[in-house]
């Protein structure tokens, strides 16, 4: 089969049917892809985990906790806020950030646990087996 051709007759019709029935609808796949893109940035991920632990922090305290500059934290918070994951509470000239709600927090805690497990089991790292050779 050359590039661009379609396969007209399935080799295994039952598995093709299972694959079709088990896939995400296009819009859900698009939304999930966008969310994973938001979560895919290390600083944004660290901001979220810091807010899980501390509940609420200002930009400066987040920058100190993460040991990164305030511009990086501010940008990360803007992206997270745009996607509805964090909210800002104004207190005079200060802004304090927290996760949007308890559902966001509990969903994020569970998602992080699952993602950490996936990363530990499926991504290269210290536990990587030597390549054959």
Describe the predicted segments one by one:
Residues 1-31, 53, 100-133:
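Amphipathic alpha-helical dimerization/coiled-coil segments
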Residues 4, 70, 91-92:
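Alpha-helical structural elements
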Residues 22, 26-69, 94-103:
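N-terminal helix-turn-helix DNA-binding core of bacterial DNA-binding proteins
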Residues 49-50, 85, 110:
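Hydrophobic alpha-helical membrane-insertion segments
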Residues 61, 81-91, 98:
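Beta-hairpin "wing" of winged helix-turn-helix
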Residues 76:
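Residues within the DNA-recognition helix of helix-turn-helix
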């Amino acid at each position: 089969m050359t590039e661009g051709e379609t396969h007209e007759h399935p080799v295994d019709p039952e598995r093709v049917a299972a694959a079709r029935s088990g896939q995400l609808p296009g819009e859900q796949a698009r939304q999930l892809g966008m969310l994973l893109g938001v979560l895919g940035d290390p600083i944004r991920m660290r901001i979220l985990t810091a807010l899980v632990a501390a509940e609420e922090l200002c930009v400066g305290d987040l920058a100190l906790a993460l040991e990164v500059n305030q511009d990086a934290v501010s940008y990360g918070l803007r992206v997270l806020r745009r996607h509805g994951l964090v909210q800002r509470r104004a207190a005079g000239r200060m802004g304090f950030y927290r996760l949007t709600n308890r559902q966001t927090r509990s969903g994020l805690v569970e998602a992080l646990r699952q993602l950490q497990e996936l990363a530990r089991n499926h991504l290269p790292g210290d536990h990587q087996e030597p390549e054959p050779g």
